Structure formats: structure tokens, C-alpha cells
Amino acid sequence: MKAYQREFIEFALNKQVLKFGEFTLKSGRISPYFFNAGLFNTGLELAKLGRFYAAALMDCGVEFDLLFGPAYKGIPIATTTAVALAEHHNRDLPYCFNRKEAKDHGEGGSLVGSPLEGRVMLVDDVITAGTAIRESMEIINAQGATLAGVMISLDRQERGRGEISAIQEVERDYHCKVIAIVTLNDVISYLEEKPEMADHLAAVRHYREQYGV
């Protein structure tokens, strides 16, 4: 685990974005942890979040020309990541996002920001069912752009209804790499370093054995 990944886990814990306990997911599964990136909701937190996304993007080795943030959660993530790439990595890249409803006046259409073209890096918080990715792919294809990769904050490394995860389905269906700042494996590695969190470690490991990929 790299330094920025450990820092991200600590950041998420401090802001209650990552919590341990018992949580019922939409799937009905009882999870020993919960991750809600929507709780990064101040200017300082958003700026810091962008730096973590930028660090992971620079680390991943995937070439891309533009950041795309799907509405709604992807919009602030794309914005703060673009700022962080420019300020901290000297990469001044365009970004773009979609509206849920197309406007018929002013800045018309469903896209806002830079023209959607070239190799697109889609940024979002998490992938649960892959629905947002499929919707985004329709937009990207309609503009003649190509999907270079998908960047998220956490990969739960968890099976969907079948034998593979929603992330693995996205990688298979769209022939792209899904990059995460951290994975569940990283969270487990972090817990292993903290003797006071042994109970949580056991619960997360058990969950991984049941539902992991």
C-alpha cells in the first residue's frame, strides 16, 4: 500500500466516510463496513479528495485526454480532480460533465464544459451496479470519444448477483481499466496494522470470504 492510499483511508475514517459496524446494503447483504463519499462535503475536504484522485491517476499509467464526471456525484469529483492535476502535477486537462436533463436554451444540450473528445477518463465515487457507467458510455460513444478508463474512490472487490463484481463486468464489457484509490484489500491491510481494530478486521475478512471476488 502506498503512502497516499494509507492517507486516504485515514482521511475517510476521520470524516466518517468509511465506517465499521453493521450496515444493510441495497442488495440486502449485511456489510461490516460502509463507505459514503457524499460526506466529503466541505471545500477543504473536496480539495483534499481531488488530490487523492489525481495521485491515483498519475500512479495508474493509463493515458487520457479529458476527465468526465457523470451527474451528479461525478461532477464535483471531476472538477476537483482537474484542479489537483493542474496544481500538483502540472497537467492542465479539460473536463466535462453531463446534465440529467438537456436544456433547450442558453448553453444547450446535455453536456457542460470542454467538448467530449479523445481518450476519456470517467471519474465517479464508487461502482455499485455499473448503471452510471453504461449511461455514460452512451454519451461518450455518441460524441465519438473513447473510454480510456474509470477512476473511483473504493473498489469493494465484491461479487454482484453473478460470480464477478460490477467492476469486473465494466472492465469486461468496455475493455477498459477501472482504477480505485483504494481496494478492500488495502482496507484489510490497514486494519492489520491496527491491533485495536481486530474485531473489525475479523468481520471484514469474513465478509470478504463470503462475497469477495
Swiss-Prot record:
Binding site for orotate: F34, F35, T128, R156
Disulfide pattern: none
Domain of life assignment: Bacteria
InterPro entries, per the entry: OPRT, Or_phspho_trans_dom, PRibTrfase_dom, PRTase-like
Described purpose of this protein according to its UniProt entry: Catalyzes the transfer of a ribosyl phosphate group from 5-phosphoribose 1-diphosphate to orotate, leading to the formation of orotidine monophosphate (OMP).
Cross-referenced PANTHER family: OROTATE PHOSPHORIBOSYLTRANSFERASE 1-RELATED
Pathway in which the depicted protein is active: Pyrimidine metabolism; UMP biosynthesis via de novo pathway; UMP from orotate: step 1/2
Binding site for 5-phospho-alpha-D-ribose 1-diphosphate: 26, 72-73, 99-100, 103, 105, 124-132
Assigned EC number: 2.4.2.10
Cofactor(s) for this UniProt protein: Mg(2+)
The keyword Glycosyltransferase is annotated on this UniProt entry: yes
GO biological process, one term: 'de novo' pyrimidine nucleobase biosynthetic process
UniProt KW keywords: Glycosyltransferase, Magnesium, Pyrimidine biosynthesis, Transferase
Record's subunit section: Homodimer.
GO molecular function: magnesium ion binding; orotate phosphoribosyltransferase activity
GO CC annotations, alphabetized: cytoplasm
Keyword Transferase: yes
Reactions performed catalytically: orotidine 5'-phosphate + diphosphate = orotate + 5-phospho-alpha-D-ribose 1-diphosphate
Pfam families associated with the record: Pribosyltran
This protein's encoding gene: pyrE
HAMAP family to which the protein is assigned, alphabetical: PyrE
Family designation: Belongs to the purine/pyrimidine phosphoribosyltransferase family. PyrE subfamily.
PROSITE patterns per the UniProt record, alphabetical: PUR_PYR_PR_TRANSFER
Name of this protein: Orotate phosphoribosyltransferase
